[in-house]
């Protein structure tokens, strides 16, 4: 808790800036595609609850900032609420010539595009930020060549030796030493097969990463898998790779994809009990990390913003009603059936989805409190 309080002058402004930026970009994706699709937009809100300030534009859209800055929404004509729950009863009261401007009255592909645009905007923002960082600062890399093997580690037991070059893990190519850490960290106590190159010959070595608790440079505890190898300048050839604009965009997309796959790996292992759920954090932990990044500099803040943007985009694509992914799931069913899911079924699904999101929020908050006072 002292770490959070010590960084308070950095934490609050940085957290609010990041949250406002990411929410604004996400909702702007919905807004722009909705407008392009001819759907009337009633409100664009950053935050929930009572309005702090705002204005109404010439199209009749109310732009506002609200008291609780933990999200946002775009309210379309014909929506029942901020979650874009369809209001079928109200639709019947709208004049036929106006129904085409409601969200519910728009063509299926326009609704799907409008909903998908929010997460896509988050992914595009992340790619852009990573591209800028790679263009300016480059990317620190090291070859996947072993310099030392920890005693009694999974690697030592499997027969890994200094000088071995890692070629692949479970058939996935390894290009840098960081690729090893990224793949192994989310697979504690899960058997893997590491292919190494030794004196020109490829050798497959089965091993099981050990579950370890480590502390990152910022003081945050984390549980991860490790096989017990390291590298150094002589073996790994530490260097900074620089990229032109187009290469940087490609690297930005690749980095975003790595975050997506790493998150999905973590969630799948969490589901089967291989990873601890206490690493699921909420606003308090994000705020604390925001303050830590701010103390390190603008590059770290931007990198953190990109990571959060990918996470928000991915979270919203989860097939849970009330989230964007839940809406897209309904549209997929509608496309297959040739007609929408019935209002009663949708209403029940939205209630269940809301309960799931609420439980996740409470769980993350509980983890934050335990972390704060632990």
From Swiss-Prot:
PROSITE patterns membership: ZINC_PROTEASE (PS00142)
Any single biological process term in GO: proteolysis
PANTHER family to which the protein is assigned, alphabetical: MEMBRANE METALLOPROTEASE ARASP2, CHLOROPLASTIC-RELATED, REGULATOR OF SIGMA-E PROTEASE RSEP
Subcellular location, principal: membrane
Organism of this sequence: Rhizobium meliloti (strain 1021)
Subcellular location(s) per record: Cell inner membrane
Name used for this protein in its record: Putative zinc metalloprotease R01501
Binding locations of Zn(2+): 26, 30
Record InterPro entries: PDZ, PDZ_6, PDZ_sf, Pept_M50_Zn, Peptidase_M50
Protein family according to the UniProt entry: Belongs to the peptidase M50B family.
Keywords, ordered alphabetically: Cell inner membrane, Cell membrane, Hydrolase, Membrane, Metal-binding, Metalloprotease, Protease, Transmembrane, Transmembrane helix, Zinc
GO cellular component, one term: plasma membrane
Claim: Protein biosynthesis is one of the keywords in the record: no
Source taxon at top rank: Bacteria
